[in-house]
C-alpha cells in the first residue's frame, strides 16, 4: 500500500484514544506514540523503510485492542472498503434461511438496499432503488439477530467510530482483500454462525464471531466468544467475519454455508492459508461490526448477577450469534473497488458515495405488523 494511503490511516489515528501517528517528510517512516493508558508511560513505535506499516499497526492493535479501523491493521491489505450503513428495518424477515416465510422465526436488524423482502432471488442490485449504505452502488442487504435485555426490551444500536456524519445506528461493513479476488456474483448469499450453537466448544470453532465489552467506543477490551459477564461502560461490540473461499459454482447451499470455506485462523481480518481445491475462488473478506448500546440497562444489572441479555432467537449465552448476507452491488462496482489499490476506507475513485442524510431516507415497509420495541412480555415469535 502506498505511503499516501498510510498517511490517510495516520489521519484516522491522530488523537484517537491517546494515539498520535505521523509520517516523515518522505512518507517512508511512520511513527506512532501511545499514551500512558497502557500503564507504562508513553511508548513510541517506529516503522523503518524496511518494515511494514501494517505490521506495526497490527502490533498496536494487539497491544491496545482499541481501534474500530481494523482494516488498516492487517499486513498486507492491497485494497479495502470500510463504510457505514444506517439501519433499514427491524422485523421478523429472513429471505436467506426462511425464504417466503412471513414472519420468520426471530427478529433481525437489517441494513442496506430497499429490495429487502421475504423472497429475494436473482439480481437484488437491479431491483433496489436506494440503500442505507454510504456506498451508493451497494444495494446488498446485511443482517444479524437483535439482542434484548432480560425483560425483552430491544437493545438500541449506536454508531461505531469514524463513520460518515449522519450515520444512524446500523453496521460498519468491511470488504478487504490481500490478493487478487473475484467479487460475489448476482444472486449470491451466505450465512455465518448459527442460532443452534449452544456450547463453548462449538462457539470457539467460529473464529470470526466475537464480542468485546467496550470500555469506551475506541477501547474494546479483550475479545470473547460469549456475552460479557459484567456491565460494559460503552456497550457490547459484536463482529461477524464471513468465510472468503467460494466453490465457484453455487450461489447458495442447503445450509447457506457449505458453498464457502473459512480460512480464518486467528485474527478475523487475516486469511493466510490458500483456498482449498474444493473452494478455489478467493472472494472479498466480508465483515460486519455492530455496537449494541447496552448502557441504558447497566443500572438494572445487579452486581454478581448473570448476564441479562438475550438474542432475539432466545439465546442468552451469546454462542449463537450469526449473520446473513445478500449480495447486491450494482454491475461490476465491487470488482472495480477490489481491483484498485487506492480503495481504502470509504474513499475509492470511481466508486460512488452518498451523504448519509440521503441514505437515511431509504426505507422499507413493515411486512410483519408486530411490535418489536418497548417492554414486551415475550420475544416476538417466542410467545408460549
Segments from the language model and where they lie:
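Fungal secretory targeting signals
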Residues: 56-81
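Intrinsically disordered, low-complexity basic segments at termini and long loops, enriched
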Residues: 1-63
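Compositionally biased, intrinsically disordered/low-complexity regions enriched for serine, proline
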Residues: 39, 46, 50-51, 73, ...
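Primary mode marks residue(s) on the alpha4-beta5-alpha5 output face of response regulator receiver
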Residues: 80-105, 109-240, 247-384
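Residue-level detector of alpha-helical transmembrane segments in integral membrane proteins
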Residues: 35, 42, 46-47, 69, ...
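Intrinsically disordered, low-complexity regions enriched for glutamine and histidine
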Residues: 2, 60, 76, 104-106
Amino acid at each position: 500500500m502506498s505511503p499516501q494511503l498510510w498517511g490517510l490511516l495516520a489521519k484516522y489515528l491522530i488523537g484517537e484514544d491517546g494515539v498520535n501517528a505521523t509520517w516523515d517528510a518522505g512518507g517512508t517512516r511512520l511513527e506512532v506514540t501511545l499514551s500512558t493508558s497502557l500503564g507504562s508511560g508513553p511508548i513510541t513505535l517506529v516503522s523503518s523503510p524496511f518494515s511494514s506499516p501494517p505490521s506495526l499497526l497490527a502490533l498496536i492493535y494487539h497491544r491496545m485492542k482499541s481501534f474500530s479501523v481494523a482494516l488498516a491493521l492487517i499486513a498486507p491489505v492491497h485494497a479495502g472498503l470500510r463504510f457505514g450503513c444506517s439501519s433499514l428495518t427491524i422485523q421478523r424477515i429472513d429471505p436467506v434461511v426462511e425464504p417466503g416465510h412471513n414472519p420468520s422465526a426471530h427478529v433481525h436488524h437489517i441494513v442496506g438496499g430497499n429490495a429487502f423482502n421475504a423472497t429475494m432471488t436473482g439480481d437484488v442490485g437491479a431491483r433496489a432503488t436506494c440503500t442505507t449504505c454510504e456506498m451508493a452502488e451497494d444495494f446488498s442487504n446485511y443482517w444479524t439477530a437483535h439482542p434484548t435485555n432480560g425483560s425483552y426490551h430491544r437493545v438500541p444500536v449506536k454508531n461505531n467510530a469514524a463513520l460518515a456524519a449522519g450515520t444512524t445506528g446500523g453496521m460498519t461493513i468491511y470488504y478487504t482483500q490481500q490478493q487478487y479476488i473475484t467479487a460475489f456474483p448476482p444472486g449470491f448469499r451466505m450465512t455465518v454462525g448459527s442460532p443452534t450453537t449452544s456450547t463453548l466448544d462449538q462457539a470457539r470453532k467460529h473464529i470470526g464471531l466475537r464480542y468485546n465489552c467496550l470500555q469506551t467506543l475506541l477501547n474494546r477490551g479483550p475479545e470473547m466468544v460469549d456475552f460479557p459477564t459484567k456491565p460494559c461502560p460503552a456497550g457490547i461490540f459484536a463482529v461477524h467475519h464471513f468465510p472468503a473461499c467460494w466453490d465457484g459454482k453455487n450461489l447458495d447451499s442447503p445450509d447457506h454455508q457449505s458453498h464457502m470455506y473459512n480460512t480464518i485462523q486467528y485474527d478475523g481480518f487475516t486469511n493466510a492459508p490458500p483456498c482449498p481445491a474444493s473452494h478455489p475462488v478467493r472472494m472479498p473478506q466480508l465483515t460486519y461490526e455492530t455496537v449494541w448500546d447496552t448502557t441504558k440497562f447497566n443500572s438494572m444489572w445487579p452486581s454478581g448477577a448473570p448476564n441479562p441479555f438475550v438474542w432475539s432467537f432466545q439465546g442468552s449465552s451469546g454462542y449463537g450469534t450469526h449473520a446473513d448476507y445478500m449480495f447486491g452491488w450494482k454491475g461490476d462496482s465491487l470488482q472495480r473497488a477490489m481491483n484498485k489499490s487506492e480503495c481504502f476506507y470509504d474513499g475509492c475513485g470511481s466508486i460512488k458515495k452518498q451523504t448519509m442524510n440521503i441514505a437515511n431516507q431509504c426505507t422499507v415497509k413493515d411486512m410483519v405488523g408486530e411490535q418489536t420495541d418497548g417492554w414486551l412480555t415475550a420475544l416476538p415469535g417466542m410467545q408460549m
